[in-house]
UniProtKB/Swiss-Prot annotation:
TM region(s), chain numbering: none
A GO cellular component annotation in the UniProt record: cytosol
Keyword Transport in record: no
Family assignment from sequence similarity: Belongs to the DNA mismatch repair MutS family.
UniProt cross-references to HAMAP family, sorted A to Z: MutS
Positions contributing to ATP binding: 602-609
N-terminal signal peptide: none
Matches recorded under Gene3D superfamilies: 1.10.1420.10, DNA repair protein MutS, domain I, MutS, connector domain, P-loop containing nucleotide triphosphate hydrolases
Effect of residue 840 to K: In strain: BB270V15
Species of the source: Staphylococcus aureus
Name recorded for this polypeptide: DNA mismatch repair protein MutS
Entry annotated with the keyword DNA repair: yes
């Protein structure tokens, strides 16, 4: 340490306190990084890695970025999973003797990005925390950029994981008692999550909720936010308590399979329900829309209230179009207010805020001309005329980005500032006159008077004009020599420079002080501005619903008291938009208390999956309070939607297609109620034909007998179509197709009854498989049909009315029968191998403690998979 310079000693001391961060260490106009930080940053940022003290025996790796463009570099690092500690100079080096004091003023983390370019305008940037006291769990989350703060509680980890996927945080804060297994599950739920520990026990004020655990979760979150941000965060709102059961529940797989906010193939917004429905005009409205898609309502009263407003906007096209024009002039009030409180707002931000609030009276007057009984928001809109006057009288219309370079305030706003500006202006007029005079006096027409921050004002003469020029004759004193010019000063110029720069410096310093005062004045309006932002964002969403309803010919849904679902000429809204509207084939669907299962057959590519998805998406849109793509729509209010669509291995957790399929089916069969919707697409295809067929039939029977959930079940197991004889609640439907001269023509029309052919070879032909393969497949198919008949006899299996009790005696019998094929020695060795170490003894204990009488077959399969993974 004795060989290290004082500046590097200071760096190492600060770095030791922030070892989990990349330290941006301010040196003049640059943020410098050293040692391993420099190696990491240079690699990620693709900037040059250099060396400090390069001539010494052990030079220090270093790299740097300009402070004025640091935000983009910080964003890149944070997006790559790094935390960045910003260490600033706390003193002016010009006025400090010795070492400049430096401190970390902020830590930028994935969940606390505040810079304008660092977060997507249409996405929330959530940071989340949770605490556990089994069986209770409390969860709190916050968007630091907007001030939103919410908390909830529940009693199971499944709801925890579902909430995390719904919120989709960029950062999770946990305490030390969270198990490694749960951490792994959280990391598998979303790719963007990072798990971080709280760093302080300091308590910050928060309105304590009645629930102690929720209070702890909120405190854990706020503690971490204050530790990293190290500044006033008064824009963070009072915590709002909510309950997950107040919204339709959809897990990660349901949202992914239905492509609500992200497409499966492209991982983008395009081609999703969010993409279709986003006709919002403000960033706040776009974020609100995504929240509404993630959390459809289950309160009929709240849904109808939204629909009434959509009705009103739909009936007033001209007013809606005018409203869209007004909204288009409204900037992101939520995040502007956040930056005001945070202290990183600039004058241009405040001009945007001024323009935004100037539209509130226009919006209020427009809504007053419509049905005020429906548009209850009109009474909550508050024209902020006093704040508007403050901003209008103070700032120029086009201020610079920096608040420390002057040029922010209007003439007449502050008398002292006007005097400084006048002195500076007069001085510059004098400089122009001096330049003209010196050109005439010296005869050098290219002579010019210039300025830079190092040398101040100077007279510059090109080298070509210096041959017969004697500077001393004109009172010129040499200041700097360049390759093509000389720079001079005079006593007169130096004297005037002090006056001009003194006035400019004083003006800039005063302007910054005035701006800070203005910022603090605007901060007083934080709560009122946030309330206006909330109202405007909701109005923006509802006008967007009306816009797409008019554009795509949607209709208002109604909700049945008897839990009937009846859709007349329904369409898939996203597929319809991608296609030509006139080419889309609409379909009907009716499910009620007597017939609540559709068994759907038909060829591949005929539209079975699209049909099932559109029923689910229409239900979601309706419970958001939006019109739906139907001629008529009567719906129940669903509490949950479960889906199993598509075939995909879960490579991260090592689960096969079939295992993923069974896990998703298990959730639906375990948690579905008569108020739920289940979408099962070709269950059982990941295993052998008879296993898959047996499981599919068992699941259909289970739904029919147990949950009575509305269910759409597509299948290629045509043997299942005879189930309608035993299950009155099941109805066979099919997606029609015709074969004409060996070619398959998809009609995409859902009709009553079953089909007994999947047209697999015809679909393969459409995919341009080699003709030799097609011909051989036809021969093999003919042989199968001739020898076995088209249908397997499994469809005639009698339904099991009462399952036999599974007990230890039956289990032992099964084991004894199995060992008939093994020698006793082999069996004993196998048993010894299974339980030969401590880990496997634990597995033995788990098996012994299983309550087999109360386990369903799928639960047993899931448990077996867990045990298998422990043995790997």
């Amino acid at each position: 340490m004795s060989n290290v310079t004082p500046m590097m000693q200071q760096y190492l001391k600060i770095k030791s306190e922030y070892q989990d961060c990349l330290l941006f260490f301010r040196l003049g106009d640059f943020y410098e990084m050293f040692y391993e930080d420099a190696k990491e940053a240079s690699r990620v940022l693709e900037i040059t890695l250099t060396k400090r003290d390069a001539k010494k025996e052990n030079p220090i790796p270093m790299c740097g970025v300009p402070y004025h463009s640091a935000d983009s570099y910080i964003d890149t690092l944070v997006n790559n999973g790094y935390k960045v500690a910003i260490c600033e100079q706390m003193e002016d080096p010009k006025q400090t003797k010795g070492m400049v004091r430096r401190e970390v003023v902020r830590i930028v983390t994935p969940g606390t990005v505040m810079e304008q370019g660092g977060v997507d305008d249409k996405q929330n940037n959530y940071i989340l925390s949770f605490v556990m006291n089994q069986p209770e769990i409390a969860l709190s989350y916050c968007d630091v950029s907007t001030g939103e703060l919410k908390v909830t509680h529940f009693n199971d980890e499944a709801t925890l994981l579902n909430e995390i996927t719904t919120i989709n945080p960029n950062e999770v804060v946990i305490n030390d008692n969270i198990s490694d297994n749960l951490k792994r599950q959280i990391n598998m739920v979303t790719e963007t999550i990072t798990v971080r520990e709280t760093l302080s026990s300091e308590i910050y004020s928060v309105n304590q909720t009645e629930h102690k655990l929720m209070y702890q979760a909120t405190q854990l979150l706020l503690d971490y936010i204050h530790h990293t941000q190290k500044r006033d965060l008064s824009h963070i709102e009072d915590v709002v308590q909510y309950a997950a059961i107040d919204y339709m529940k959809m897990d990660f797989y349901a949202k992914r399979n239905l492509e609500l906010t992200e497409s499966i193939r492209l991982k983008s917004k395009k081609g999703t329900l969010l993409w279709l429905m986003d006709e919002t005009k403000t960033p706040m409205g776009a974020r609100r829309l995504k929240q509404w898609i993630d959390r459809p309502l289950i309160s009929k009263e709240q849904i109808e209230a939204r629909l009434d407003i959509v009705d009103e906007f739909s009936a007033h096209f001209i007013e809606r179009d005018t409203l869209r024009t007004y909204l288009n002039q409204v900037y992101d009030i939520e995040r502007l207010v956040g930056r005001v409180s945070y202290g990183n707002v600039n004058a241009r931000d405040l001009i945007q805020l001024k323009h935004s609030i100037s539209e509130i009276p226009n919006i209020k007057a427009l809504l007053n001309s419509m049905n005020q009984n429906t548009l209850v928001q009109v009474n909550q809109l508050e024209p902020l005329d006093d704040l508007l006057d403050i901003l209008e009288q103070s700032l120029v219309e086009e201020p610079p980005i920096s608040v420390k370079d002057g040029g922010l305030f209007k003439v007449g706003f502050n008398t002292q500032l006007d005097e400084y500006l006048e002195a500076s202006k007069n001085g510059k007029t004098w400089l122009a006159e001096l330049q003209a005079k010196e050109r005439q006096r010296t005869g050098i027409k290219s002579l010019k008077i210039s300025f830079n921050k190092v040398f101040g004002y100077f007279i510059e003469i090109t080298r070509a004009n210096l041959q017969n020029f004697e500077p001393s004759e004109f009172g010129y004193m040499r200041k700097q020599t360049l390759s093509n010019a000389e720079r001079f000063i005079t006593d007169e110029l130096k004297e005037k420079e002090d006056i001009i720069l003194g006035a400019e410096d004083k003006a800039i310093e005063l302007e910054y002080q005035l701006f800070v005062q203005l910022r603090e004045e605007v901060k007083k309006y934080t709560e009122r501005l946030q309330q206006q932002a909330k109202i405007i964002s909701e109005l923006d969403c509802l006008q967007s619903f009306a816009e797409i309803a008019q554009k795509y010919n949607y209709t208002r849904p109604s909700f049945s008291e008897n839990k009937t679902l009846e859709l007349v000429e329904s369409r898939h809204p996203v597929v319809e938009r991608v296609m030509d509207y006139n080419d889309y084939v609409p379909n009907n669907c009716r499910l009620d208390n007597e017939t609540f299962i559709y068994l759907i057959t038909g060829p591949n590519m005929s539209g079975k999956s699209t049909y099932m998805r559109q029923v689910a998406i229409i239900s979601i849109m309706a419970q958001m309070g939006a019109y739906v793509p139907c001629k008529e729509a009567v719906l129940p209010i669903f509490d949950q939607i479960f889906t199993r669509i598509g075939a995909a291995d879960d490579l991260v957790s090592g689960k096969s297609t079939f295992m993923v399929e069974m896990l998703e089916a298990q959730k639906a069969l375990t948690y579905a109620t008569e108020d739920s919707l289940i979408i099962f697409d070709e269950i059982g295809r990941g295993t052998s034909t008879y296993d898959g067929l047996a499981l599919a039939q068992a699941m259909i029977e289970y739904v029919a007998e147990t949950s009575h959930a509305k269910t759409l079940f597509s299948t290629h197991y045509h043997e299942l179509t005879t189930l309608d004889q035993a299950l009155p609640s099941l109805k066979n439907v099919h997606v029609a197709a015709n074969e004409y001269k060996g070619e398959l023509i998809f009609l995409h029309k859902v009709k009553d009854g079953a089909v007994d052919d999947s047209y697999g070879i015809q679909v393969a032909k459409l995919a341009d498989l080699p003709e030799k393969v097609i011909s051989r497949a036809q021969v093999i198919l003919s042989e199968f049909e001739a020898s076995a008949g088209k249908k397997s006899s499994i469809s005639n299996l009698k339904m099991v009315e009462n399952e036999p009790e599974i007990n230890q005696e039956n289990l032992n019998l099964s084991v004894e029968e199995t060992t008939d094929t093994l020698s006793q020695k082999d069996f004993e060795q196998a048993s010894f191998d299974l339980f030969e170490n401590d880990q496997e003894s634990e597995i033995e204990l788990q098996i012994k403690n299983l309550n087999l009488s109360n386990m369903t077959p799928i639960e047993a399969l899931v448990k077996l998979s867990e045990l298998q993974n422990q043995l790997k």
